[in-house]
Amino acid sequence: MLYQKLELMLTKFKVLPLLQKSFLGIVFIYSIIALYYFLQKSPGGDEMLFIADLELIKKEGWMHAIEKNISIPYMLLVYPLSLLLKNYVALRLVNVLLLILLFVYFAKRKDTFEFSFYGYLLFFISTVGYFFFGINDTLFFLGLIIYLNEVNQLQKNNKWNGTLAIIALLVSFFTRKLIFVYSPILIFSWYIIYKYKGFKSLNIKLLIPILVLFLGLNVPSFLHKGNISYDLKNPPKNIKATWTQRQYLAQLMVNEGSLPDQQHPSWEKTDAYLIANGENSLPENLIDGLFFDINLTVKEFFKELYSCMFYGFRQLGLILFIPLVFLIKDILKTKKLNISMMIPICLLVMICIFSLIIISFMELRWLAPVFILTIVYFSDLQKEKIWNSTIIKANYFVLLFLSFYGIFSLWTKF
């Protein structure tokens, strides 16, 4: 009774339109501040790898750079601009243009222009910041987002641009090795395409030359190393430890209190640990890490799962949880997994996969494609008025608070 009275009062005073307009205004300001803050930062972190790749191309040529391993699609986009601008400026400018392309894509693909959807998208991009960094993640994410969204459109209303979807997937595939971690939901998506006969609409005459082009560009890498050219953060030449060993040791040290959370030991310290404790004292690769200490794997899985939900809430608000609730309700009702729940299923699967395989701290940016698709899913629910308006209002309240918090956090860093 009290809930109904509260709902009636909120409706009477037209709280929802007021909240929506307030959120859109604040998030616009938030996005301007975030854009300026992240673009004016000095280059650092993973950006240095791509700056070094550009320098390598300019000094040694494309053949040598591809043999060494670079992200070919990303470098092809950045290289022409790097001849006119500083390397890090060219890297970031390409990512800003890719972001604009993402907004244009959704504007073309969505049936109606929904201010709330673009507000949610701006909030997410402004909060995470990494779309403005000069790294290849933005191109990788863009390809996966377009591909998965097209598959979602196929299962939802049997309308999809299959050729665009496969081109986008090919771009992602040749951009980052991380694509292989997404294999479970990619296999799921191929099943959906098969079930809805989406393969029949593909323009094979266009797709085959594009695939041949990408394979041809990778020939130097195939001949030199026998694999696709992906950017690699290789350890120093005198180091024997692997990235998995360094990350695994990091979690061991964090658990015993000898290393701050979300930090790594030096490569030298990792090598010293292997010398002192034996070569088999740390797992050499990702698969070994899963079974090296089952108790630790299970413990860290739940820690990472909690961390993902906690920090994911900071990036998405209630948008993160509502599709998962919707999925649970659907499973309880139908006693099966329905294809109509594609996006919630993909979200849950990828959260669980990254929580399982990452023994040390997880970087939430790896989940960006499914997080943005979650925004798509939530905005569709909002448009179709499937959820009670109180949920929408509560989400606006949460995002308004988080937007003010984000603005304050960025402002204090100037």
Predicted regions and their residues:
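Transmembrane-helix signature of polytopic, membrane-embedded enzymes
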Residues: 103-128, 142, 343-344
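Membrane-interface anchor segments at the N-terminal boundary of transmembrane helices
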Residues: 89-90, 95, 284-354, 358
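Perimembrane helix-loop-helix junctions
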Residues: 3-8, 12, 150-153, 182-214, ...
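Transmembrane-helix motifs of polytopic, lipid-linked glycan transferases
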Residues: 93-114, 146, 325, 329-330
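Short acidic/glycine- and proline-prone juxtamembrane loop motifs at membrane-interface regions
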Residues: 70, 132-140, 363-364
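Short hydrophobic/aromatic helix or loop-helix immediately within or flanking a transmembrane segment
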Residues: 49-55, 63-86, 96-97
